[in-house]
Amino acid sequence: MKNQNLSVRKLARCGMVAALYVVLCMALQPFSYGAVQVRVAEALCLLPVFGAEYIFGVVLGCFLANLLGSTIVDVIFGTLATLLACLVTYKLRNIRFKGLALAASLPPVVFNAVIIGIEIAVMFPDPTSSAPLWLACVTNGISVGIGELISCTVLGVLLVRIIEASPSVRKVFEA
């Protein structure tokens, strides 16, 4: 019975994380979508630092948010980028720099910069530009990467720090 209660608790936490991701994206919609974006909900990509079950919650939230506010291509590739980012974030969860989860914040930045940068360049080419596709991919990747740095390396690391600093809050997030 105790294992069943633990599973129900983990499932409930995943559902809450997914819902929070969607709510943050919808509430901050002008900032959450497009080539220039700071998707505040991406700070939640650092929650796998506290357990693998958060991978599912964040990925589900990303999938639903993209389903509600983006294209089918972004539903697929944006969700894939978030899945890969969360998996690697989980693997890097114990690497700390001066006590901060900085290493864990980098996978969302890198995966989203590369995957979404390419997606935007291919799906929304600038008809007024004669620049090669690779340059558009790099330019869009830098733009997305800067937004992800703000969301994950600033807000996400701060979120992890706040959770870890409070034993009662940390207990809620850990298995």
Predicted segments with their positions:
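Hydrophobic transmembrane alpha-helices
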Residues: 2-56
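Membrane-helix interface "capping/anchor" motifs
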Residues: 48-58, 93-102
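Membrane-embedded alpha-helical hairpins and interfacial helices in multi-pass inner-membrane proteins
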Residues: 30-35, 43, 63-81, 88-175
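Small-polar-interrupted transmembrane alpha-helices in polytopic inner-membrane proteins
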Residues: 21, 58-66
